[in-house]
UniProtKB/Swiss-Prot annotation:
This is Tetratricopeptide repeat protein 9B. Residues 16-31, 106-116 have a biased composition (Pro residues). The keyword Phosphoprotein applies. Keywords: Phosphoprotein, Repeat, TPR repeat. The keyword Cell cycle does not apply. Belongs to the TTC9 family. The modification Phosphoserine is found at residues 7, 27. It comes from Homo sapiens (Human). TPR repeats lie at residues 65-99, 171-204. The lineage of its organism: Eukaryota, Metazoa, Chordata, Craniata, Vertebrata. InterPro entries: AIP/AIPL1/TTC9, TPR-like_helical_dom_sf, TPR_2, TPR_rpt.
């Protein structure tokens, strides 16, 4: 196996009947034609893909994901935010395909000792590429969403938390999560994320401004609760 190539650790099992072309170079040792005559009668059902097809599909999905991410970055620089969002979503779909989906049109193998053990496993290099691309896509999606005329703060919160699952020290995701929780009315969580962002960037004026806004909201809510409680007690006394 060539070093640095995007190829799966596990390959498909040997097909019961070899294709008319030579086997791929990355076939595992010992793979070859199965039982049955080359010129015998056709077996019912589709013929399994040759060994290496899953690796080609995986490689193709990863390349497509990186390409879509690059297109999204270009659209963002050109302030085409809706187009950028579409590109990032397509990149994420390709990453999902790379992390377990079988190639399009490939039937599930019949159970038995010769069936494939499952989707191709990612090598360490491939896993790092998937993770970094995924984080960049979600991080960029939040930036695009915050540029929208009507911001979907629930989606911003969701994507920020996905980034923080992989990179707990990501400043932008922490700060944007605080913004999302603030606009969703969850001021306690907003303050927690914003203070965490301030601990990483103590002089960031945007972070400091949102901390002040959040504290004002929390104080106002506290006063409203006190007034509501006092009013309830007054009504009880009068009644």
């Amino acid at each position: 196996m060539q070093r640095g190539a995007l190829s799966p650790v596990l390959m498909l099992s040997a097909a019961p009947e070899p294709p008319p072309r030579p086997p791929p170079a990355l076939s595992p040792p010992g793979s070859g034609p199965g039982s049955g005559s080359r010129h015998g009668s056709a077996r019912p059902g589709p013929t399994p893909e040759p060994s290496g097809s899953l690796g080609a599909a995986l490689d193709s999905s990863l390349r497509a994901a990186v390409a879509f991410k690059a297109e999204g970055q270009r659209c963002y620089r050109e302030k085409k935010f809706r187009e950028a969002i579409g590109k990032y979503h397509r990149a994420l779909l390709q990453l999902k395909a790379a992390q377990g989906a079988r190639p399009s049109g490939l039937p599930a193998p019949a159970p038995g000792p010769t069936s494939s053990p499952g989707p191709a496993r990612l090598s360490e290099e491939q896993r790092r590429l998937v993770e970094s691309t995924e984080v960049e896509c979600y991080d960029s999606l939040t930036a695009c969403l915050l540029q929208s005329e009507l911001v979907n703060y629930e989606r911003v919160r969701e994507y920020c938390l996905k980034v923080l699952e992989k990179q707990q020290g990501n400043f932008k995701a922490t700060y944007r999560a605080g913004i999302a929780f603030y606009h969703l009315g969850d001021y306690a969580r907003a303050l927690r994320y914003l203070q965490e962002a301030r601990s990483r960037e103590p002089t960031d004026t945007n972070v400091l401004r949102y901390i002040q806004l959040t504290q004002l909201k929390m104080n106002r809510c506290s006063l409203q609760r006190e007034d509501s409680g006092a009013g309830s007690q007054t009504r009880d006394v009068i009644g």
